[in-house]
Amino acid sequence: MKAREVNFDGLVGLTHHYAGLSFGNEASTKHRFQVSNPKLAARQGLAKMKALADAGFPQAVIPPQERPNLAALRQIGFTGSDQQVLEKAWRAAPHLLSAASSASSMWVANAATVCPSADALDGKVHLTVANLNNKFHRASEAPGTERLLRAIFRDESRFAVHGALPQVAMFGDEGAANHNRLGGDYGEPGLQLFIYGREESGALVPARYPARQTLEASQAVARLNQVDPQRVMFAQQNPAVIDQGVFHNDVIAVSNRQVLFCHEHAFLHQQALFDALAEKVPGFTPLVVPAGAVSVQDAVETYLFNSQLLSRDDGTMVLVLPEESRRHEGVWRYLNTLVAADNPISELKVFDLRESMANGGGPACLRLRVVLTDDERQAVNPAVMMDDTLFTRLNAWVDKYYRDRLTQEDLVDPQLLREGREALDELSRLLSLGNVYPFQQ
């Protein structure tokens, strides 16, 4: 059956700030306490969505979550009115107020793992919410993510949204950022490749930074998503690159249809993995970047692999990159060599996403890929699909509510909380979401 990939991009939230919350993510740590610009961040994300929609790639939006997350602060012992909770957290533990105010839900590659209907035993599209167990500021996203996904993928005859795995280290799950799908046409059954960083009894783990995804979590997600067992493989990411800042697989590899674009050091036992993929995926095309051309450090700094690989109707592919890749002489030289060579990648598209990039999130982090047939696409909440009207409305909404400067000190301001709730109340109507936010209950 004919199907297309729809990219659902996360809309940056009003509390986007730099707090260095993500140990193992070097950009996040490097830009700690810098001044952020939430308005610019949201506009940069919207510009990418609209440009890709205009280029013929179906595009939709996932709204931000309510932040500061007062329920999370109350759960860890801060009491009183909303304003008192903010003030007590700020005085006692500003890093916890930062965590509860994080706009990290913008990186929807970590929202869920998706199984297209062609790969599922029951013929439905499945989405399993990620628990993001490794980081407090992200683990609190799961309930909000589930509500938002249910408001977008409402038709239970076509879509199955599953809640997150248990919030324990054994089932640490980071969503689609550690998941690749390979195959032919999108509507045909494909092969799902789950990438993990550690397993419960395994000795091979990184030494410096945490491995956030477990094999046990990947296996559980595959079961929940009803992936045909004949169409799934599990592979371990190279622990050495995790220690160099590759905290998710989408920082060192990206796949699309038959192509896997990755670094020479991306996977443990990489050649054996490629041999297995070649047996299962007709026309499997690994495009491997040698360390001599691009080091792991340069890949992390430029987010060369945190890119989007998109298919045109003629079978060629477009690689969507952050501006940082163009500014690095060696990486840009390599990319131009790649495009000139005999492979499906025929064009580079570059976007300025520096507000997101400074927190460690590139083009791939900002999107959740969902393969949908025409009928399934018709069943998605139509209000979230990107077009001229939605683009204009969302930009006007951002201009109305977002600040152009935010520091950690601003998070205690009760006016920021009020602005956020007013904005999200309006957004929930604009996107026909219903009452999805806690303050609306």
UniProtKB/Swiss-Prot annotation:
Q: Which GO terms describe its biological process?
A: arginine catabolic process to glutamate; arginine catabolic process to succinate
Residues in the active site? E174, H248, C365 (nucleophile)
Residues annotated for substrate binding in this entry: 19-28, 110, 137-138, 212, 250, 359
Enzymatic reactions:
N(2)-succinyl-L-arginine + 2 H2O + 2 H(+) = N(2)-succinyl-L-ornithine + 2 NH4(+) + CO2
InterPro entries xrefs: AstB_sf, SuccinylArg_d-Hdrlase_AstB
Keywords, comma-separated and alphabetical: Arginine metabolism, Hydrolase
Q: In which pathway does it act?
A: Amino-acid degradation; L-arginine degradation via AST pathway; L-glutamate and succinate from L-arginine: step 2/5
UniProt cross-references to SUPFAM superfamilies, sorted A to Z: Pentein
**EC numbers on record:** 3.5.3.23
Q: Does the keyword Transmembrane apply?
A: no
MF terms in GO:
N-succinylarginine dihydrolase activity
Identify the enzyme class: hydrolase
Xref: Pfam families:
AstB
Its annotated function is as follows: Catalyzes the hydrolysis of N(2)-succinylarginine into N(2)-succinylornithine, ammonia and CO(2).
Family, according to the entry, reads as follows: Belongs to the succinylarginine dihydrolase family.
Cite the record's note on assembly: Homodimer.
- In Swiss-Prot or TrEMBL terms, this protein is called N-succinylarginine dihydrolase
